[in-house]
Amino acid sequence: MAEQNAASTTGVKPSPRTPDFSPYLDFDRAQWRELRNSMPQVLTQKEVIELRGIGENIDLAEVAEVYLPLSRLIHLQVAARQQLTAATETFLGTSPSTSVPFVIGVAGSVAVGKSTTARLLQVLLQRWNSHPRVDLVTTDGFLYPGAELTRRGLMSRKGFPESYDQRALLRFVTDVKSGKLEVNAPVYSHTAYDRVPGEFTTVRQPDILIVEGLNVLQTGPTLMVSDLFDFSVYVDARTEDIEKWYIDRFLKLRDTAFRRPGAHFSHYADMADPESIAVARELWQSINLPNLVENILPTRVRASLVLKKGSDHLVERVRMRKI
């Protein structure tokens, strides 16, 4: 795929209801889809079905109207970063070196659809000729192993910032961005609800690295992984909608993944609907909602772009940071 007439503009203006002093440009879906700029559809319905998560309704229309414009925006930013790198090398009088990977962060609540967003971006960005090597790593692999979480008394805080090996995550992204030939990321099993001992995903000098996780936009007094992002996406929705999606997903997992051999949550597999819903709601209210309110939602303001979903799990509005 190649960008045609990249410097041209469609003349689409953000929603007039957005005040001029807002740090974001606000687009409804109709306005945002115009920024696709005649990009061809590169996915099939079969591919979209394979990429979407449990309970999501994403289809070819959603890809065309939301994700193709987003992939075009990121493509243009990658090209601009490559030009900046070339300008720096010209200034230094050095020969072109291994390009610095463009790093994208994808954040949002559990059950909001951030994993699907990350997978879609990976596939769409791979279709551009100028950056075909796109790797995706989730921060789940950087959760402390179950035994360590138990030792620290953090099992009930799993998914909260303190349950991650932040140093290892920062070191991983730093090594990738520094051009290291091979960098390994730990692998996490949702079935076992733990890291897989001795298993790693190897990243080899990608053009683009996507880092997806609950708390990837966190800041702190020292260098954080978010400081290394070139672009970031926050997948947003009303809290009550996310709660419903979480419960619906729990019920589907009860009938599928929880029944697999060795599943950590196998004790939920034979629960009736009323009991399952009560358990899911308790898990949401005691763990996932506090994490969203205290740690995840406050990082939304740091995102380069916010995808706002409606109750049907489809994107309704897009907010793009302008400063």
UniProtKB/Swiss-Prot annotation:
Its main location: cytoplasm. GO terms for biological process: coenzyme A biosynthetic process. Residues 1-12 have a biased composition (Polar residues). CDD domains: PanK. Residues 1-24 are annotated as: Disordered. Keywords: ATP-binding, Coenzyme A biosynthesis, Cytoplasm, Kinase, Nucleotide-binding, Transferase. It is found in: Cytoplasm. InterPro entries: P-loop_NTPase, PanK, PRK/URK. Its EC number is 2.7.1.33. The keyword Nucleotide-binding applies. It catalyses: (R)-pantothenate + ATP = (R)-4'-phosphopantothenate + ADP + H(+). Belongs to the prokaryotic pantothenate kinase family. This is Pantothenate kinase. The lineage of its organism: Bacteria, Bacillati, Actinomycetota, Actinomycetes, Mycobacteriales. The gene is coaA.
